[in-house]
């Protein structure tokens, strides 16, 4: 097969591993910067171009689109989809998962347990919002934040009010969530491919922090997950419509709680911690699903 990887930086670990895994299985691979793709959108001659040339048909496209370029990156991916390429994560699923508020609403509708979450626009509702999530300590999150950026633990009610007011002063969209104290700065990252959790790690926050993101200096170890955690991770990914997802779960006294569903999970931390060939599993999923029937169905 001919596979395109959409990424701004082909030297990143995940891109290199996906390229390596695909080539090892006999596929042709090209890494394309989505911001250098441009499109002709017309009924008779839709096409996609790259650095002065019209791109050929790709059997499959692997999106590695960062949150900063979600709008244009998913537009480029959507054009590949329209031309019959199989996407490992559809554009609509990526945009759904990137919207933190929408994704939490969808997960809640499916009965998937979450930390109690509140959102309000008016400053008049701040007090009720804090009460809604159980009072302080609580977590304030930027809706647009990633990798632990824009996440603040407010230890007291006064601190919570100050943080919320400060974010509002910047015209930022925020969520307020209950603080799961018993998680002790730990969470479980489940890597889902299709209908299977192929690997899971426990992430631990560095000393003095409560954010367990590896990008923030957190540590990782292999996690043994329960059947319930496995079921919830798969259901969360499927609710977003994602073939590949990193599902972050907090272990609370009342049971596992989904914190976030990541549409473009990094492979380095999970592969190096567990030894699982996740890139290979992703390519195998493409091989099973990027069929001629798919191309006919989508008009390719």
From Swiss-Prot:
Residues that, per the record, bind Mg(2+) 1: 248, 260
Gene3D superfamilies: 3.40.50.20, ATP-grasp fold, A domain, ATP-grasp fold, B domain
Chain sites annotated for binding Mn(2+) 1: 248, 260
GO biological process: one example: SOS response
Positions contributing to Mg(2+) 2 binding: 260, 262
Single GO cellular component term: cytoplasm
Domain of life: Bacteria
EC number(s) per entry: 6.3.2.-
Cofactor: Mg(2+); Mn(2+)
Binding site for Mn(2+) 2: 260, 262
Domain ATP-grasp: 104-287
Single Gene Ontology MF annotation: ribosomal S6-glutamic acid ligase activity
Homology family: Belongs to the RimK family.
Protein name: Probable alpha-L-glutamate ligase
Lineage, top ranks: Bacteria, Pseudomonadati, Pseudomonadota, Gammaproteobacteria, Enterobacterales
Gene assigned in the entry: rimK
